[in-house]
Amino acid sequence: MSKDLIARYRNAGFEAVADGAMAFFDRRTDLQRAGVAFGPGGGVEPAKVSTDISLVAIDRSDPDAFGLSEVILRGVAAGLERYVHERPLFRSVCPDQELFVMPIFNLQRYAPGEGFKQWHCDWTISDEATEPVHRVLAWIL
């Protein structure tokens, strides 16, 4: 049983998911947008500088994006299962026993010199499908 909060998992399956996401990002320039971070604002430079593609995992209108979303969700679900197996307390502290609710996520690319420029959060605290105020775990792939 691990007591570390942060875990790193690596295997050929996860690497294939990452390669697929990178290829999708390069191929789908039509979906790329300037990254957005929510914060106090008013600064000279934005909280982050990136190029993002937002995906909605339940949206079947774009078969290419939906297919990638499905692969990413399966990969994250496998990582989550391993994570909570190593940390069983997570299963007991989540009241609804639902640890994976995330139909919306971003692919973010940072070119040299880009990235986080100031304190920020990626989501507001408004009522959104991602329920950010109730987030227990976040994934960076």
Describe the predicted segments one by one:
Residues M1-L141:
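Fe(II)/2-oxoglutarate oxygenase catalytic core
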